[in-house]
Design a protein with these regions (language model features):
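An N-terminal assembly and electron-transfer interface module characteristic of large anaerobic redox
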Residues: 1-152
Length: 152
């Protein structure tokens, strides 16, 4: 089941990393680790980290988690930069629009899931870009700002 979930989350772009917390010495856990190594070799972008609850030093487990998180963070950052390049928006564009629309800053605001995007920030950027494209008042305001000559 663990292997299937890992494949599902990776193929459907639902996360950047899977961390499996397992009891030490559990036979099904040991078997799934063997299968998981084969699966990870097939899906090159998959980040999978098995951690056993005992038998492994706390410092060792902590450093392994930190390394895997750094990989996942880099993957999420690259995905976000790709979304910005694809939409043609800048961070300042997104921040300005969000500042003018306080509902987007609510903690419980539901951002719709976009297929092929795993990261929350990238999902939000795609969503705000779609809102900006549909917002006539915003488009009109941005055209007026571009039409004004800049005085030195």
């Amino acid at each position: 089941m663990e292997v299937g979930k890992n494949i599902f989350y990776t193929v459907n772009h639902l996360c950047h990393m899977v961390l499996a917390l397992k009891p030490f010495g559990c036979m099904p856990s040991t078997q799934s680790d063997g299968v998981q190594s084969r699966v990870v070799s097939k899906f090159k972008d998959m980040i999978f980290l098995p951690i056993e609850t005992s038998g492994e030093g706390e410092v060792n487990a902590h450093s392994r988690v930190q390394m895997a998180l750094a990989e996942a963070k880099a993957k999420a950052r690259a995905e976000f930069e790709g979304v910005l390049n694809k939409t043609g928006r800048t961070m300042d564009d997104l921040r300005e629009y969000v500042a003018d629309h306080p509902e987007l800053r609510r903690g419980l605001y539901k951002v719709p899931h976009q297929d092929g995007i795993a990261g929350t920030a990238a999902q939000f950027a795609v969503h705000v870009d779609a809102l900006m494209s549909r917002d006539r008042a915003y488009r009109r305001r941005s055209r007026v700002a571009m039409a004004r000559p800049k005085v030195a």
